[in-house]
């Protein structure tokens, strides 16, 4: 991100060249084994396409005044990652700032949740999503998914979704890794998503029976 903000407006940068540069920096990291999925590099209105994939036909230059979203990940000896960041290139409008604040609030609310053992992702999803619902907004994807080590980066059966699927979601267990990735997508304008990986950790037992309070750790 430092490289991007330092060079935007000074040299030509496109969605594809930005993605290549960021992937190249990752490849220089110790114990890097390879990308964990195809990167998403989305500028401006392309950010509103949840699974946008830049190619030679859709590729556009990055300029100041809009948002840029990058969703990338890598496989390492120590684990696999899936991380999304959205950054402002120069000054952006008030609506983009307001939407970014909503997404950040939602992501942090879920990341700091403490819950009783036995809860599934379906019990917790609304903790993040309520921030949007109060503003008449929503996003049409899960708030998080399980992460596979050197396998599928989207790995079940755990997830954060407000609606139960055909099979009941299992309880979150200690040491499970799950993503936290709320977003806002405004067609023709912008998209914002922030994504971290969370580790499920036990905390304390109390008088409410043979269960432990559990919390998520970013």
What are these regions (language model features)?
Residues 214-218:
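Conserved small/polar residues in nucleotide/adenosyl-binding loops
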Residues 49, 94-101, 107, 111-112, ...:
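C-terminal active-site-proximal or functional interface alpha/beta core segments in diverse enzymes
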Residues 33-34, 111-125, 137-143, 179-180, ...:
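Acidic/polar loop patches that form or flank catalytic/metal-binding clefts of enzymes
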Residues 55, 81-86, 145, 190-197, ...:
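Composition- and surface-driven signal marking solvent-exposed, interaction-prone regions
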């Amino acid at each position: 991100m430092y490289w991007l903000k330092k060079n935007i407006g000074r040299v030509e940068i496109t969605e594809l060249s930005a993605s290549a540069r960021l992937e190249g920096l990752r490849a220089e990291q110790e114990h890097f084994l390879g990308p964990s999925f195809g990167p998403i590099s989305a500028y401006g209105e392309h950010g509103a396409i949840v699974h946008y994939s830049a190619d030679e036909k859709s590729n556009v230059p990055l300029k100041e005044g809009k948002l840029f979203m990058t969703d990338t990940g890598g496989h390492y000896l120590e684990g696999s990652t899936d991380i999304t960041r959205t950054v402002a290139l120069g000054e952006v409008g008030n609506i983009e700032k307001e939407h970014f604040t909503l997404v950040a609030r939602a992501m942090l609310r879920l990341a700091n949740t403490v819950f009783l053992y036995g809860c599934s992702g379906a019990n917790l999803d609304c903790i993040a999503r309520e921030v949007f619902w109060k503003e008449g907004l929503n996003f049409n994807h899960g708030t998080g998914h399980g992460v596979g080590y050197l396998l599928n980066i989207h790995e079940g059966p755990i997830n954060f979704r407000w609606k139960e699927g055909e099979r009941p979601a299992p309880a979150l267990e200690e040491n499970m890794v799950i993503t936290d990735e709320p977003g806002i997508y405004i067609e023709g304008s912008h998209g914002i998503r922030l994504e971290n990986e969370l580790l499920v950790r036990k905390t304390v037992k109390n008088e409410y029976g043979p269960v432990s309070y559990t919390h998520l750790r970013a």
